[in-house]
Amino acid sequence: MKLKRISAFLLAVATAFTVAGCTGDTTSSENKNESTDNSSVTSSVTSDVNSGDNNNTGSQTLFEFGQVAMGGGGFVSGVFATKEEGLYYARTDVGGAYRFDKSLDRWVSVSYDISEEDRGLLGIEALAFAENEPNKLYLLAGTEYFSNGKSCLLISDDYGKTFTRTELTDLIKVHGNGMGRGNGERIALDPKNSDIIYIGGRTGGMIKSTDGGKTFTALDMGTKTETANSNGICSIVIDSASGDIYAAISRKNEDNLYKSSDGGNSWTAVAGAPKDMMIQRMKWSNGKLLIVYASEEGPWNNDRVKGGIQIYDPAANTFTDISPAKKGFGDVVVHPEDANKMVACTENLYVPQPNGAYGDEFYVTTDGGKSWKLLNNVMTMSDGGIPWINSSSIHWCSSMCIDPNAPDKIKVVSGNGIFACDNIWSDKPEFYFNSKGIEETVPYELVSIVDGPLVSVIGDYDGFCQPDATTFGNVHNSIAGSMTSIAVARKNPDVWVKCGGDESNPGFWYTEDAGKTWVNVKVSPLESKKRAYKGAVAVSADGKTFYWAPENGMGFIYYTTDKGMSWTKSEGGMATSFISADPVNPDYVYATSSGNFYMSSDGGKTFKPNRELSVFTATRPIVTPDTEGRIYYAAMGLQISDDHGETFNRVDSVSSCLSVGIGKGKDENSPYVIYIWGKPKGEEELGLYWSEDEGKTWSRINDELHQFGGPGNGGFVHGDFNTYGRVYMSTVGMGIVYGDVKQ
């Protein structure tokens, strides 16, 4: 076996576009390429790729990486305008950070190069930039439950094209996907010296750097900063005139706003500040401090009837209530040339919006908050070229920005992406979805149908059906929340099944018309008759038998031959994580658990384990669309079976395989390509590799700049059955990434 590494020289010369990422001291390239409005943006990497023959003659191959075009799909926790025309930044809770590229009129990820080991750094807790040098970008990154809770400050001086890293784990705790993640910002730069940086932690209090973030020391605020809601210090702002620092602590019924006039060496509680609400955000305007309040830290637990907006005048030491209503608010922005003109948004309110969905309210004032106009009954909403959003609302509005160069323009975050309005002061403001380039879904499964579309299931928003990776599709019309599994009958490809749901919603659906209509099965397979939900599904090759291993069914497999009118429990097969049906013979079904590989030869009535195969972690059994009995399985390396799983042969060339997928081959001599997330023998780096000769030789198709945090929650790698050289991979919060081979 011959393995050829990526040539650093070729990469430097031939990488046409760069990806910005968050690894320490690495040069990355921007996720940027010319693209039509309805397609995803790609970035490129050049590799020496083995041709697959025994002579190991290589050919130069260009791989282009992008994200499958869904559009938004997750909570964007902060959005920011800069003084540079057309330059915006955004942060997300699980999908990294983005920069708006005005030349492409879309968002560009700056987080492609996060490794699987460091995938927690895709949770961005806070974002800051130097006011007069917006190329200097700072990201506070970390996720409590990933990467051993690693907390880091990621520092860039080139708009996020490259980053250096300062680890903060021993000083403070960061959790980009924690409650209160829409609060902010927890980073503040001294307006007169951007090398002086203050950061507030969920635990650990406040820390300060005087060398641009290279080193930090802890500050004593004279009060306990750890809070019952684990949100800690949630906002820091600095008065550019006086240099005074204000910090908010996420608590109520006690002092929660503190001030320092000596660079953080000493702190005092601000007298007269409201104590019965929690501070969400703070910002300076015209020498006064605007403070936004809600009953809890958010984004979804506020009681919706308590909150407001206060103006603090430090000269008079007075607070003035300018709330549009007694409701929880997320943010307020001020016209840069007229401090009397402001826009405010609620957070976690659910009232009618123009498209019929329920979400937050928007208000404007032109008299400094003496009176406010509600916009919900006069504004309009449009999809911005991403059609699935038409049935969704603008909600969880915890951050807004106003363009200092074009103050008619605002952007606001939502639980599903970013919305924008370019005429906010008009009588009929026009809001539109502004999320092209942002891909923040959490994918759980994807199926490439031969001569058909891509179908997927994701967290929160059901899933998508789309003609290809670069065209925005529509969500399944069942719109049933989080889905965990989907399968297609390979010989009857109009029949699909999927599962999701929860304790209150039946969790199995099927379609017999390729997703045009879905039927929700009401009958539970569980003996207790409790609602079954989530788990794994499969459908026989002929589409006549459905299989389901519900998450709350102890991993037992159930099958139905009457479309869910009745269910029968299979014998054998326990703690099941994945099910696959043979693509040709409807009698054969395969299942896996963390301890066993199971096969059935009687249509799922009984399953027996393969006692010869050691399985420690359950992965998907992968089948080809037209070959009976052939199974690819990631276990103790890469295993292949040609007899329905009775026996497996280990591929000697692979030392580690965490996920495996199959895709369309180049020609009849190589009908299928194998893709893995793993390590062939002789390779040191975990990554995406492919083989065109059934595993005899392998070549890496990604590099350190294209890691995407690894396969994430979905844990899948799949090839496309219609496009040669296209591979898909799930992520923890960057949607589904894909790579295309270009000769």
Q: Which ranges hold each PLM region?
A:
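Extracellular glycan-interacting surfaces
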Residues: 2-5, 9, 20-34, 47-743
